[in-house]
């Protein structure tokens, strides 16, 4: 195996012990990363090995008295004692769990096995002995408290939908956090742990949004064909008129992370709405934050259930909302969402325009390419490889179904992408050109998986807006101005 790195995990309350871990890469079995944990006595420099090359554990922290550890990992950690999935399912190890580990007995016990939210971070507070957990809770990001004595978990009544970060005092009953919601930017609060009261410390949102009009945001859920409730929401344009017909944009990730309610994000749904679109987003099967069973649906799926839910949700939304022009629906996603964009077009013709940013077109090439390919696929298609399931790798790849695509498709990609290499878009572009389909391909020079250069980001955003204007509003002028016809 190859040792990747060493990490400091925690320092004990009395400052005597240092908890550190090492990460080792193992190619020949799952998971490909194994962690070892050590306790270093800073007085004697003696090292106590807690565990070696353990799978599915991430990091650990001391309890206030130093007798236990709070361990973050996946449900499969510690021989699966935290696993809570159906028979026949494979765990999605991106779904985070917490465990208590007794240093004397060297035994672990699950804390969050029956707790649906996905654990992002946790702190064992020295002041009151409670554990504070930041987690994805459906499309919210919330803080919960857990009593380690009895395992009871309660929600902290924070004032924002998305808690971005938090900090606890060691010697006072106070928690500071900042966050945002679907229609406001970040605000900073102090929370009284005893009284349960929030006090606004600073409102950055007021300054940011003082000259901006936002449309309304509404929740909208539906039951899929198998009876699962699929959660979503929609954004209306400012000055919305229910008697008009609006084009609609459907946004999704479709992978293992939820599309949360944050105002500020790379794919701003309020921004699309401000341009005169209704925007519908949803969190289909496989998303974390909805319980381990729901998250496990992501494994070895690659669009199988997800596409059905996106198509069904889009059709039902149009049926129930007469203000949507069902002939003018666009869709957009990035990375796994870019894969979903491409895959959806092989399954349906309900979209009038589609955009794939950094999308995966062939599982067989992505699996072995990029910095994340085989590592991400060790979860997304655990145990499934090109040599033991060649039909799966072709059947679920948009490239191998390119002849079924009829929707005008825009492919966007940074040409320095180390996650999903640009070849994924190049080969889909080549296929669709050979097939005589409507496709455009825009490379962003020097950009990686996300477009972060300021001027390049503006150009990238305008490209998206212009593509939708061309196909959903019958206004091609913006696109022509950006990309005039050329004769070689």
Language model segments and positions:
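Active-site-proximal cap/loop segments of hydrolase catalytic domains
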Residues: 274, 281-488
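Non-catalytic accessory segments flanking enzyme active sites
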Residues: 3, 7-10, 15, 19-22, ...
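The serine-hydrolase catalytic nucleophile loop
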Residues: 253-269, 284, 423-424
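Residue-level detector of Asp-centered blade-edge/turn motifs that repeat once per structural unit
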Residues: 13-14, 64-65, 126-128, 170-171
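Short loop/turn segments that connect beta-strands within beta-propeller blades
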Residues: 41-45, 102-106, 147-151, 193-196
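Short beta-strand element of the alpha/beta-hydrolase
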Residues: 244-254
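A flexible loop/linker signature enriched in serine peptidases of the S9 family
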Residues: 3-6, 21-37, 51-61, 71-99, ...
């Amino acid at each position: 195996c190859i040792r990747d790195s060493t990490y400091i995990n925690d320092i004990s309350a009395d400052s005597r012990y240092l908890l550190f871990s090492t990460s080792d890469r193992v190619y020949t079995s799952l998971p490909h990363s194994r962690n070892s944990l050590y306790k270093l006595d800073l007085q004697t420099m003696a090292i106590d090995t807690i565990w070696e090359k353990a799978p599915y554990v991430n990091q650990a922290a001391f309890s206030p008295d130093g007798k236990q550890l709070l361990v973050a990992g996946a449900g499969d950690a510690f021989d699966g004692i935290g696993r809570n999935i159906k028979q026949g399912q494979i765990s999605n190890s991106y779904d985070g769990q917490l465990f208590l580990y007794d240093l004397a007995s060297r035994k672990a016990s699950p804390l969050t096995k029956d707790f649906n939210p996905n654990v992002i971070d946790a702190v064992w507070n020295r002041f009151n002995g409670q554990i504070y957990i930041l987690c994805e809770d459906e499309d919210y990001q919330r803080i919960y408290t857990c009593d380690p004595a009895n395992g009871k978990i309660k929600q902290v009544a924070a004032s924002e939908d998305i808690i971005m970060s938090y900090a606890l005092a060691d010697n006072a009953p106070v928690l500071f956090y900042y966050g945002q919601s679907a229609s406001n930017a970040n605000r900073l609060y102090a929370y009284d742990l005893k009284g349960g009261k929030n006090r606004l410390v600073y409102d950055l949102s007021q300054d940011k949004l003082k000259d901006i009009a936002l449309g309304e945001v509404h929740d909208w859920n539906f039951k899929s064909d198998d009876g699962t409730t699929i959660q979503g929401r929609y954004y209306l344009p400012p000055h919305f008129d229910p008697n008009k017909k609006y084009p609609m944009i459907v946004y999704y990730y479709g992978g293992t992370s939820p599309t949360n309610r944050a105002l500020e994000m790379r794919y701003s749904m309020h921004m699309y709405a401000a341009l005169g679109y209704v925007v519908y987003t949803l969190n289909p099967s496989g998303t974390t934050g909805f319980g381990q069973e729901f998250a496990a649906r992501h494994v070895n799926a690659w669009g199988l259930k997800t596409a059905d839910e996106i198509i069904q949700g889009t059709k039902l939304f149009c049926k129930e909302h007469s203000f949507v022009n069902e002939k003018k629906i666009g869709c957009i996603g990035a990375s796994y969402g870019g894969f979903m964009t491409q895959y959806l077009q092989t399954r349906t013709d309900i979209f009038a325009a589609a955009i794939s940013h950094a999308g995966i077109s062939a599982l067989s090439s992505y699996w072995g390419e990029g910095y994340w390919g085989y590592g991400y696929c060790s979860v997304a298609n655990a145990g499934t490889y090109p040599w033991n399931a060649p039909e799966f790798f072709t059947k679920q790849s948009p490239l191998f179904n390119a002849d079924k695509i009829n929707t005008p498709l825009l492919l966007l990609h940074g040409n320095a992408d180390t996650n999903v290499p640009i070849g994924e878009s190049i080969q889909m572009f080549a296929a669709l050109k050979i097939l005589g389909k409507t496709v455009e391909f825009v490379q962003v020079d020097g950009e990686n998986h996300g477009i972060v250069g300021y001027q390049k980001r503006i150009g990238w955003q305008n490209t998206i807006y212009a593509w939708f204007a061309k196909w959903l509003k019958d206004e091609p002028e913006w696109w022509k101005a950006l990309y005039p016809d050329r004769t070689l």
